[in-house]
C-alpha cells in the first residue's frame, strides 16, 4: 500500500468519531453507531482505493451498515481489504463512558481472516513475550510463561479482561495466582493495543469477546510486533446452552464451515493477520487509556488519532482541530 494512504485513513476514523460524538451520552447506541457508519462510508468512498469490507457491521442485506463484502473507495488505486469498527464501544458512547473509539484496519487483499460475527477467545501480549503464548495450554501456564519472558514475578504481571459474568471464575483464578487484574466494561481493541505500547503497564489481554474485534486487534498487534492467539467459539458455548443460544450457535458453526474455518481450533496471529503491511487508525471518541476523547466548543472540535503503519512500524499520534461548519455538506449532516 502507498504510505500516503495512512493520512487518508486517519481522516476516515476522525469523521466517524465526530459523528459518534454527536450522540454522546444520549442513551441511543444504535443511532450513534449508524451516524459513525455513514460518516465512515462517506470518507472511505473518497479515498483512491479498490477496497472491500471484510470485517464490518453486518451482512449484505443489512444496509445501511458497512456490510461484509461491500466495495468502498473510488475503485482506483490499491486493492485492499478493510476491517472496520465505526464505534468500538457503542454502549460507552451512549452512556458517556471512557474508552470509546472509531477504528479501521487496512491490509493487502487476503490479509485478514474473514471471521464470522461470533465470539472469540483471545490471548494477546506485547513484543517482549512474543512466541510464549498457546491457547492449547491452561491460562495459568501461559501467564507463568509470559512472566518468565518479561523477567518479572506473577505478582507484577498485569492482565486486562472484560468485566463480564462469563469471566468471573477466570478473574478469581488470576487473582489467586497473584496477578494484577484490570477488569474493563468494554473495549478490548484499545486494551489489546496497550499490551504493545512501551509506556503501558498492561502485559496481557485475555478473555472472550467479539471475533470481528479480534481480527482488528490482530492487525494492529501484527503491526506492532506483538503476539496473539484466538479461538472461535459458538454462542451456546459462551452464553449457555439453551434453545435460542443453540440455534444461533449452530448457525455460526455452519458459517464457519462454509468459510473453511474450524471453530474451536487455536488461531495464531499469522492466521488472522497474514502480513504486517497494514495501516491502523483509531480516533478517540471519549477519553480513555489509549487516546484523548473529542473536545468540542461550538463548531470547533479537537480529536486525537493513533495512526500506525505496520511496514515501517511507525506510530503517530495526531491532534487535529476541525471547523465542523467547513466540512462537506454531506458530512455536516452527521457531525453538526
UniProtKB/Swiss-Prot annotation:
| pH effect on activity, per entry | Optimum pH is 7.5-8.
Names of required cofactors? Mn(2+)
Gene Ontology molecular function, alphabetical: fructose 1,6-bisphosphate 1-phosphatase activity; manganese ion binding; protein homodimerization activity
Reaction catalysis annotation: beta-D-fructose 1,6-bisphosphate + H2O = beta-D-fructose 6-phosphate + phosphate
How changing residue 61 to A affects the protein?
Great decrease in FBPase activity
- Superkingdom in the source lineage: Bacteria
Q: What is the effect of changing residue 90 to A?
A: Strong decrease in FBPase activity
Q: What is this protein called?
A: Fructose-1,6-bisphosphatase 1 class 2
Induction and repression of expression: By glycerol and sn-glycerol-3-phosphate.
Q: Where does Mn(2+) 2 bind?
A: 85, 88, 213
Organism field? Escherichia coli (strain K12)
E.C. designation(s):
3.1.3.11
Please give the subunit comment from the record: Homodimer.
Entry note: cofactor = Manganese. Mg(2+), Co(2+), Ni(2+), Ca(2+), Cu(2+) and Zn(2+) cannot support activity.
Q: Which SUPFAM superfamilies match?
A: Carbohydrate phosphatase (SSF56655)
Any one annotated GO CC term: cytoplasm
Record pathway: Carbohydrate biosynthesis; gluconeogenesis
For the ligand (substrate), the binding residues are 88-90, 119, 164-166, 186-188, 210
One further remark on this entry is:
E.coli K12 also possesses a FBPase class 1 (Fbp), which is the primary FBPase in E.coli and probably represents the main gluconeogenic FBPase.
Give me the residues that bind Mn(2+) 1, please: 33, 57
Amino acid at each position: 500500500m502507498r504510505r500516503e494512504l495512512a493520512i487518508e485513513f486517519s481522516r476516515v476514523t476522525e469523521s466517524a468519531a465526530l459523528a459518534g460524538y454527536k450522540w454522546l451520552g444520549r442513551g441511543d447506541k444504535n443511532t450513534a453507531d449508524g451516524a459513525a457508519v455513514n460518516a465512515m462510508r462517506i470518507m472511505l468512498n473518497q479515498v483512491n482505493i479498490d477496497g472491500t469490507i471484510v470485517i464490518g457491521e453486518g451482512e449484505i442485506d443489512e444496509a445501511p451498515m458497512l456490510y461484509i463484502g461491500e466495495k468502498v473507495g473510488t475503485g482506483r488505486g490499491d486493492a485492499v481489504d478493510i476491517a472496520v469498527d465505526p464505534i468500538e464501544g457503542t454502549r460507552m458512547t451512549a452512556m458517556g463512558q471512557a474508552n470509546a473509539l472509531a477504528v479501521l484496519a487496512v491490509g493487502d487483499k487476503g490479509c485478514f481472516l474473514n471471521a464470522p460475527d461470533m465470539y472469540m477467545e483471545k490471548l494477546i501480549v506485547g513484543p517482549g513475550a512474543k512466541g510464549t503464548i498457546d491457547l492449547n495450554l491452561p491460562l495459568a501456564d501461559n501467564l507463568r510463561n509470559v512472566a518468565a519472558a518479561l523477567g518479572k514475578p506473577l505478582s507484577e504481571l498485569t492482565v486486562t479482561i472484560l468485566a463480564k459474568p462469563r469471566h468471573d471464575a477466570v478473574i478469581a483464578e488470576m487473582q489467586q495466582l497473584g496477578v494484577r487484574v484490570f477488569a474493563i466494561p468494554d473495549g478490548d481493541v484499545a486494551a489489546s493495543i496497550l499490551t504493545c505500547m512501551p509506556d503501558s503497564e498492561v502485559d496481557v489481554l485475555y478473555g472472550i469477546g467479539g471475533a470481528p474485534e479480534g481480527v482488528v486487534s490482530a492487525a494492529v498487534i501484527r503491526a506492532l510486533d506483538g503476539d496473539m492467539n484466538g479461538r472461535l467459539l459458538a454462542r451456546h458455548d459462551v452464553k449457555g446452552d439453551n434453545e435460542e443460544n443453540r440455534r444461533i450457535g449452530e448457525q455460526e458453526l455452519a458459517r464457519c464451515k462454509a468459510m473453511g474455518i474450524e471453530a474451536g481450533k487455536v488461531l495464531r496471529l499469522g492466521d488472522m493477520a497474514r502480513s504486517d503491511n497494514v495501516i491502523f487508525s483509531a480516533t478517540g471518541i471519549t477519553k480513555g487509556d489509549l487516546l484523548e476523547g473529542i473536545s468540542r466548543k461550538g463548531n470547533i472540535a479537537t480529536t486525537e488519532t493513533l495512526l500506525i503503519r505496520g511496514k515501517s512500524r511507525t506510530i503517530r499520534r495526531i491532534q487535529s482541530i476541525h471547523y465542523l461548519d467547513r466540512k462537506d455538506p454531506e458530512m455536516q449532516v452527521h457531525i453538526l
